[in-house]
């Protein structure tokens, strides 16, 4: 459960991410595909080289979707409902990939922070991204 402090920290940390969605998204996906090559399975039709237009476009979609969740922290499930359905029913993405994506996103945010993230910010982001992952896999049952 996100506390009011968590929500405030998530919103603050997310500002630069949402303003640079393509950059953060592409970099996060590059990290994901590098660290966890099995996740490439769903993107066989993409050019997965760093900086490719495919990574930029899809990365922006990912960040924009998570931004929608940030904008609806009191109803993350509602904000991600259609996306959850899509990934569970049509795309059939392995649910573990959402946790991996969240981890790579946290690393990307930290890398662009200009210094270490405060522990309480890391905790709040982690709680939020775990909630996002949990929400996205909720339709798998």
Curated annotation (Swiss-Prot):
Q: Which residues form the Globin domain?
A: 1-141
BP-aspect Gene Ontology terms: hydrogen peroxide catabolic process
Question: Which InterPro entries does the protein's record reference?
Answer: Globin (IPR000971), Globin-like_sf (IPR009050), Globin/Proto (IPR012292), Hemoglobin_a-typ (IPR002338), Hemoglobin_oxygen_transport (IPR050056), Hemoglobin_pi (IPR002339)
Entry keyword set: Heme, Iron, Metal-binding, Oxygen transport, Transport
Tell me the superkingdom of the source. Eukaryota
List of residues binding O2: 58
* Expression sites by tissue: Red blood cells.
Any GO molecular function? haptoglobin binding
Where is heme b bound in this sequence? 87
Which Pfam families does this chain map to? Answer: Globin
Q: Report the GO terms under cellular component.
A: blood microparticle; haptoglobin-hemoglobin complex; hemoglobin complex
What exactly does this protein do? Involved in oxygen transport from the lung to the various peripheral tissues.
**What family is it from?**
Belongs to the globin family.
Self-association or partners: how does it assemble? Heterotetramer of two alpha chains and two beta chains.
**This protein's name:** Hemoglobin subunit alpha-A
Q: Which organism is it from?
A: Drymarchon melanurus erebennus
Q: What does the organism's lineage look like at the top?
A: Eukaryota, Metazoa, Chordata, Craniata, Vertebrata
């Amino acid at each position: 459960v996100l506390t009011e402090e968590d929500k405030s920290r998530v919103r603050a940390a997310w500002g630069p991410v949402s303003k640079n969605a393509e950059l953060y998204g592409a970099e996060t996906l590059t990290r994901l595909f590098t660290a966890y090559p099995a996740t490439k399975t769903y993107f066989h039709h993409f050019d997965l080289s760093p900086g490719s237009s495919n990574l930029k476009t899809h990365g922006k979609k990912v960040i924009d979707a998570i931004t929608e969740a940030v904008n609806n922290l009191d109803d993350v499930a509602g904000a991600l409902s259609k996306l959850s359905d899509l990934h569970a029913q049509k795309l059939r993405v392995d649910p573990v990939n959402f946790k991996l994506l969240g981890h790579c996103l946290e690393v990307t945010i930290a890398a662009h922070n200009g210094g270490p993230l405060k522990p309480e910010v890391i905790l709040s982001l982690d709680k939020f991204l775990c909630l996002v992952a949990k929400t996205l896999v909720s339709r798998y049952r």
